[in-house]
Amino acid sequence: MRYEVLTQTLPDNFDWRKQKVVTEVKDQGKLDVSDVFAVVGAIESCWAIRTGNLNTLSEQQLVDCGRNETSANLREVFESVSSLGGLAPNSSYPYVAQHQQCKLNKTEISVRIEGHLKMHNEEAMARYLMAKGPFVVAFNGKDSLASYKGGIVNFNSTQCPPTKLSQAGLVVGFGVEAKMPFWILKNSRGGKWGENGYFRIARGSNTCGIASNVYSPFFDVDIGGPNIFVAM
């Protein structure tokens, strides 16, 4: 792989939903699998950006075949996608919100990834988002979203310790409201939760650990061109 320097000027607002490359908000139900939904969402969106094909992919495949139920282990979920050879469509392996025996037919896999990369810096995250697509984050969801109805989550590190990563989400955009920068995240609690299934959280100060555990997929179409980045 080669390195790409991302130096584009950041606008005040950017949202991949406007480009029709984000699938509808899903509902994980009773299972603690927000990391699975976030990773699948990132693969769906990033694949759509690269190919023009927005496919709804299977979370149930990862629940059944991928890894044990945990709270926010993003790297392990990406590794499961790679080891299984990719993801099947949701239509062939639909979500049922419970654990089953693995039923994966590998001939049905429709999207494969080459691997995943990790980010740290929120400036780099914003530049990457614009250049490459949505990515997944782990954060302290217990303290940040317990009573969320809308608005921008903006707690200090005492109110929402950044080391207690308990949930994952898909970052699809960013913006500024009343001089407060924020991230836009897709949750997996259905479209009636929060702001039509999404929530906003303060950007620039690692609020609730939002910049502590950040990953994105990359694909075979990225190989041969620059796909690891340095933000300036």
Where are these regions (language model features)?
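Catalytic-core signature of thiol
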Residues: 1-232
